[in-house]
Design a protein with these regions (language model features):
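Acyl-CoA thioester-binding alpha/beta core of soluble enzymes
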Residues: 1-107, 173-183, 261-264, 279-316
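Generic structural signal for helix capping and beta-alpha/helix-loop junctions
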Residues: 6, 87, 110, 164, ...
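Short, hinge-like loop/turn segments at secondary-structure boundaries
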Residues: 13-17, 117-122, 197-203, 289-290
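Redox-cofactor-proximal catalytic regions of oxidoreductases
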Residues: 23-43, 119-141, 145, 203-212, ...
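A structured beta-alpha segment of the ubiquitous adenosine-cofactor-binding alpha/beta core
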Residues: 78, 120-174, 185
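Glycine-rich nucleotide phosphate-binding loop and flanking beta-alpha elements
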Residues: 84, 107, 138, 160-162, ...
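Glycine-rich phosphate-binding loop and adjoining beta1-alpha1-beta2 segment
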Residues: 98, 102-130
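Active-site-adjacent "lid/gating" segments in soluble enzymes
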Residues: 165-315
Length: 316
């Protein structure tokens, strides 16, 4: 459940939960921007004036710049990542006009061989790709040359691997101090899970999302084979699609924050994002605690809704 996830050791160690003055807990910043960290602040005063202020705040209509350019035109992104979460984030940046160069291992991103390449077509849209052996000196020098001219670097290596490859933040900063360096992985760099490999079902289940989308708990009793197949399919449907794209959106948003901070402060920085924190935010409606907090409203077994006034009804 989300309430169990709030005290998860990796969530706590990576700063995804902060203590409130009333003894409760709430989500921390969306990402860890190492030079311009976010401040969640304290709880707002119980004052209806906040609602009036929000209503009166002018809204800016979305759109292109006056010259027709997309918002990230002129921004160069170097992606050294595989599978879905980080590559999809880079594709979102390409949708906003960024030039994205994807560095793949010899033989290509393994995701190209899954699902007949259908998923890969989306996560690699809008990019130019090249295959490089990062463990070779020649390959490393090519990548360092690309880094020198990049605005953003995205990778999804576990802690320690970039340093061994010569592309850790302190190494990259020496040749490009203005770079926005996005480090995205499973559990985060701190805490007991830092060195564990991660696939999407783990953060999806660990942060409470699966239980919420299941509608009811998996029976604890032994099941007949047909019932077991039914529950297996139900588990997969509740956890297969969300965790990676949830993380992609957080990566994209955090990079945009880094680019804005660079524009305002004149310096690049390292940004840390992990799948646990991203999927905690996907469950933000209940990822908090305070005295007297009600239980999370759960959908019924048929997944028709949360209550009599928030559900699907059959109409004739």
């Amino acid at each position: 459940t989300t309430q169990q996830a709030i005290v998860d050791p990796d969530i706590v160690a990576n700063g995804h939960v902060v203590d409130r003055q009333d003894g409760g807990k709430q989500l921390g910043p969306l990402a860890r921007l190492m030079r311009t960290p976010g401040d969640p602040g304290n709880e707002a005063a119980a004052d209806d004036g906040w609602a009036d202020l929000w209503v009166s705040t002018p809204r800016i209509a979305p759109g292109r710049s006056n010259d027709g350019r997309l918002p990230l035109a002129g921004v160069r992104v170097l992606e050294i990542a595989t599978i879905i979460a980080a590559p999809l984030a880079a594709s979102f940046l390409a949708d906003m006009g960024a030039e994205v160069i994807k560095v793949e291992p010899i033989g290509g991103d393994p995701f190209r061989g899954l699902l007949g390449g259908l998923g890969s077509a989306k996560v690699n849209a809008g990019k130019r790709s090249l295959s490089i052996d990062l463990k070779s000196e020649t390959g490393r020098q090519i990548v360092l040359g690309l880094i020198k001219d990049a605005d953003v670097l995205i990778h999804n290596f576990r802690p320690g691997v970039p340093e061994r490859l010569g592309i850790g933040y302190t190494q990259v900063e020496k040749i490009n101090p203005d770079i926005v360096y996005m480090q995205a992985n499973g559990y985060g760099p701190d805490g007991p899970g830092a060195q564990r490999p991660s696939t999407h079902p783990i953060p999806g289940a660990a942060m409470g999302g699966v239980l919420y989308q299941m509608g009811e708990r998996v029976p604890e009793a032994l099941l007949e084979i047909d019932d077991l197949r039914l529950w297996t399919r139900r588990l997969m449907h509740a956890n297969e699609v969300n965790p990676d794209p949830n993380t992609s959106l957080v990566i994209t948003t955090s990079i945009l924050l880094g680019l804005v901070a660079r524009q305002r402060k004149g310096q690049g920085q390292q940004i840390l994002v992990d799948m646990f924190g991203a999927n905690a935010y996907a469950n933000s409606d209940d990822f908090l605690s305070f005295p007297g907090k009600p239980d999370r409203a759960m959908p019924d077994a048929e997944l028709l809704g949360l209550s009599a006034t928030y559900r699907l009804y059959h109409c004739t």
